[in-house]
């Protein structure tokens, strides 16, 4: 993670030492592994290393073969040799990011066994730390959209800091964007983000306070990670020098160029999609879920459609035919701290591809195979799922959805 920018000892206190410091480093480490794993997952989908595979007449969706992946990692210079590749993938397995498809092997082996990213089968564990990390990542992506101007260079106590937000303005924005219903709720969210090391005061001197104090995100979620970084036991913040174009740092009143978050796009840059509930909403996994905040990335997401859950294709005309065997239902779904908990796929009409059984959508009565008629009063029968996705993700936290359900379904 990038420090909010101090090059000296200013702002260091007891909160960064002892057990608190160790806990903070572990949270930083976890966050880096999560981002690295997600970037690898998207890349493997893009290059078709992850795909449906068959063994003994059974199909295993969204899998990769361990031996083939090791070949791929070496070929793409993500690992120097097979032993190193095994160690790297074991790091992801130890964090619960990947697993053997039948959970028969805890060790990652250089053999023809099927493994899968847990985000691709909906089994990724969502503890409080992961939830806070995902929420922070979504807010970061939203703030980094071209039309958002909340993050600005600002000065505090005579020192200039890059990519800062003012606490009071950030709280206003959270309520305005539907991320929180009240200012108090927004402030509680900021306290959680700070406790989990996602945001910090620019000089690390203050907790989060509704004031004109300046804060920054500690992590550049968009930085392209190298898999080899997983073997580096140093604090993630030490992996980026002050000369890095991705490094958040404070600037004095000299004429040094600001190198904070320059738009550097390496070849084959991974397009990170941060709108997630157990899986990226536009990823290949059939268990991706809508997040409670939009993805407004300037880059198109990596797209890859899972097999449809529908038994047969259905047209909008068929749904609207008088006497057709479909019943209309309306749901009001309030997003929780993680999201709404469902996936839309298909086109003209879209359908519900997956529903998180523990999410708000399931609680409201949503089921797979239902067809989406309208979102917040807007008819969407004749658009594709990308349009519906954008409508949901850029709308309010509470959504009203009308669906049609086949009576025999």
Curated annotation (Swiss-Prot):
Please list the residues that carry the modification Phosphoserine. 235, 244, 258, 263, 265, 280, 282-283, 286-287, 291, 293, 297-299
Q: Report the locations given in the UniProt record.
A: Lysosome membrane
> What's the impact of mutating residue 293 to A?
In mutant 13A; abolished phosphorylation, leading to promote interaction with MTOR without affecting ability to bind phosphatidic acid. Reduced ubiquitination by the SCF(BTRC) complex
Per the UniProt entry, the effect of residue 225 to A is: Decreased phosphatidic acid-binding
Activity regulation behaviour:
Inhibited upon phosphatidic acid-binding: phosphatidic acid produced upon mitogenic stimulation promotes DEPTOR dissociatiom from the mTORC1 and mTORC2 complexes, leading to their activation. Specifically binds unsaturated phosphatidic acid, such as 16:0-18:1, 18:0-18:1 and di-18:1. Inhibited when nutrients are present via a feedback loop: phosphorylation by MTOR promotes DEPTOR ubiquitination and degradation.
Q: Kindly give the SUPFAM superfamilies that the UniProt entry links to this protein.
A: PDZ domain-like, Winged helix' DNA-binding domain
In this chain, where does the modification Phosphothreonine occur?
Answer: 241, 259, 295
Checking SMART domains in the record gives: DEP, PDZ
Task: Quote the annotated effect of residue 326 to F.
Answer: Does not affect phosphorylation
Record note on what altering residue 231 to D does: Decreased phosphatidic acid-binding
- What is the protein's major site of localization? membrane
- Protein name as annotated: DEP domain-containing mTOR-interacting protein
According to its UniProt entry, this protein's organism is Homo sapiens (Human)
């Amino acid at each position: 993670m990038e420090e909010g920018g101090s090059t000296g000892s200013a702002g260091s206190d007891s909160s960064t030492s002892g057990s608190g410091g160790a806990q903070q480093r572990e949270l930083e480490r976890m966050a880096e592994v999560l981002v690295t794993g997600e970037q690898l997952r998207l890349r493997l989908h893009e290059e078709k290393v992850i795909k449906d595979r068959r063994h003994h007449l059974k199909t295993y969706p969204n899998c990769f073969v361990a031996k083939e992946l090791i070949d791929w990692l070496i070929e793409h210079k993500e690992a120097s040799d097979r032993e190193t590749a095994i160690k790297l993938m074991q790091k992801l397995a130890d964090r619960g990011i990947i697993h053997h498809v039948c959970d028969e092997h805890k060790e990652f082996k250089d053999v023809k066994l099927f493994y899968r990213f847990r985000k691709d089968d909906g089994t990724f564990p969502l503890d409080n730390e992961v939830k806070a990390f995902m929420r922070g990542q979504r807010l970061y992506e939203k703030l980094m959209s071209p039309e958002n101007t909340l993050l600005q260079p600002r000065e505090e106590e005579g020192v200039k800091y890059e990519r800062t937000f003012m606490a009071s303005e950030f709280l206003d924005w959270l309520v305005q964007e539907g991320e929180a219903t009240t200012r108090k709720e927004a402030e509680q969210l900021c306290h959680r983000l700070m406790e989990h090391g996602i945001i910090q005061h620019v000089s690390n001197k203050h907790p989060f306070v509704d004031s004109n104090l300046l804060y920054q995100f500690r992590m550049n979620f968009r930085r392209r990670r190298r898999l080899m970084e997983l073997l580096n036991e140093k604090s993630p913040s030490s992996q980026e020098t002050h000369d890095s174009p991705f490094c958040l740092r404070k600037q004095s009143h000299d004429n040094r160029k600001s190198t904070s978050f320059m738009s550097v796009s390496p070849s084959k840059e991974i397009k990170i999609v941060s709108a997630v509930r157990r899986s990226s909403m536009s990823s290949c996994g059939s268990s991706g879920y809508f997040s409670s905040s939009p993805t407004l990335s300037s880059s198109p997401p990596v797209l890859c459609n899972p097999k449809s859950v529908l038994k047969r294709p259905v047209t909008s005309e068929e749904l609207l035919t008088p006497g057709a065997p479909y019943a209309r239902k309306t749901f009001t779904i309030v997003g929780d701290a993680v999201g709404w908990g469902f996936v839309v796929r298909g086109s003209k009409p879209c359908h519900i591809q997956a529903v998180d059984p523990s999410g708000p959508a399931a609680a409201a009565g949503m089921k797979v195979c239902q067809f989406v008629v309208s979102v917040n009063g807007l008819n969407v029968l004749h658009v594709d799922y990308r349009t519906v996705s954008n409508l949901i993700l850029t709308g309010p936290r509470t959504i009203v959805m009308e669906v049609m359900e086949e009576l025999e379904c």
